[in-house]
Amino acid sequence: MTSRKIPSIMGTQHPDNANAPFWESSQQPFISAYRETGEAFENFNELNVDEYMWDWEGKHADAAVIDRLFSTEYDYFKDHQIGRDKFLTFRFPNIWEEKGYNLMQAMTAFLSSEDFAHDLGFSRPLFEAILPMAQRADQILKMQVLFEKLANFKSAEFTRSDKNTPYIEMIPLFEDFETQLHAPEILKEYLNLHEEHFGFRPKYMRVFLAGSDSALTAGFMSSITGNKLAIARLHEFAEEENIEIFPISGTGSAIFRGGLSPHRIDRYVTEFPGVRTATVQSAFRYDFPIEEVQKGIAELKEKLPVAEPLKISLDDQKILTEIAEESAKFYSNTLDNLVPSMQAIFKAFPKRRDRRQHVGVLGYSRSVDGIELPRAINFTGSFYSVGVPPEFIGFGRALKHLDADHLSVFVRSYPSMSKDFNELARFVNMDALQILKTQNSAWAEVEEDILIMQRIFKFEIGPQTREEQQHAEIALQVVQFKDGAPVAITALINRMAQLRHFLG
């Protein structure tokens, strides 16, 4: 069993917060790159997160983060050492998807931080990194080989005293259904490549499963099913290969993106048992009273490490795989036709972080059937902003399409389904949907999804609280004026986000 502490809570920089952070005196929800070092400390200190993701993928990041934290908060980090008690985990850029100009900068930060920590008598602060959009075993090893070469070069040419550690641990981030489903096969090949190069097999691995991009590209039914299959198969793999696997689940507060909020802790643990690290994104941390946030984090820390991992029989795995693949077709076919009518909303969507340009030389884009999509938070919030939660897209028709055996397995695998869609129905605005239908007939398919779910679960469609009523009224305004002034639409989207406690 690994002797290191495995973090239960990872704070992230996902820009899904509606409100200003609790530590932000200006009460502005936008968080500049210059404030993110202080943000990391506040999350360690005030919220007691175990780990904080430092994101280099498609955004600006400060390479001096460790130097700044040690210099400004020396007493705290003397007692709560990064790399031993608290963890700062870099998410590297994926050099197969973007130019990766800052990969060497990120890797160099590992080395200089180790030097600084050594001089202070601290533990090595940075020793593992996330590889986003991992597709193949050789990509995971490539990151380690590049780091090894850089560390050895620095030790030979620039270091006069102790040599740098020429090894980092990698956390593959599997983002789509196929890579999540086949994570065990990818990891098996990686372990062989690792042993071939380094002469030993890791005793443990942390494996990151995305909840947002899988929903964006294949729909909510496929995403939640894929996450469950991956968790179950990873724990099976751990037993077969005699290696400890600690799954990380990337989930936002919107149900479409995983549904983890301070109000849904039990639901999360029920749906994803076997996850050992949960991401608490910006909405979780900043869109609820701080006492509720602290309580939710404490509860997750108590429940995640001891939850009995999800077990799915081979027969049920086969059925769930078929369900995920079929449901993705309903989602994608409809989405292809909806995206053009959502462009004005996507463009007006408010920003919360310093991002690099999304496409072209500096970045990359997500796409479905060749159609470019915005990031998952923008996408999710945009559909909520027109009164149509994206969880419904394709879900109703896919559910109706299931035969008795498939339906039985799916219902058993998703115990919160009825409760989730009862909640989601309160954010549906049928008046707004009727207007959207007159502009684009593809919205009729989404209406069909909603009505099928209503017939099955007997829920009421529309708001049930004062805040939800305000949300519905604003959604109608957004639809009526969506091609008007973007500044006005942005203001409306911001207000709706505050009412539902997440931006997207």
UniProtKB/Swiss-Prot annotation:
**Keyword terms:** Carbon dioxide fixation, Lyase, Magnesium
> Which reactions is this enzyme annotated as catalysing?
oxaloacetate + phosphate = phosphoenolpyruvate + hydrogencarbonate
Q: Compositionally biased, Polar residues: which spans?
A: 1-16
Domain of life, source organism: Bacteria
Q: What is its EC number?
A: 4.1.1.31
Which GO molecular function, any one, fits this protein according to its record?
A: phosphoenolpyruvate carboxylase activity
Which intervals of the chain are annotated as region Disordered? 1-21
Q: Which cofactor does it need?
A: Mg(2+)
Which GO terms of type biological process are on file?
A: carbon fixation; oxaloacetate metabolic process; tricarboxylic acid cycle
Pfam family for this entry, one: PEPcase_2
The answer to whether keyword Magnesium applies is yes
- Give the similarity note: Belongs to the PEPCase type 2 family.
Query: Quaternary structure per UniProt?
Result: Homotetramer.
What functional role does this protein have?
Catalyzes the irreversible beta-carboxylation of phosphoenolpyruvate (PEP) to form oxaloacetate (OAA), a four-carbon dicarboxylic acid source for the tricarboxylic acid cycle.
What name goes with this protein? Phosphoenolpyruvate carboxylase
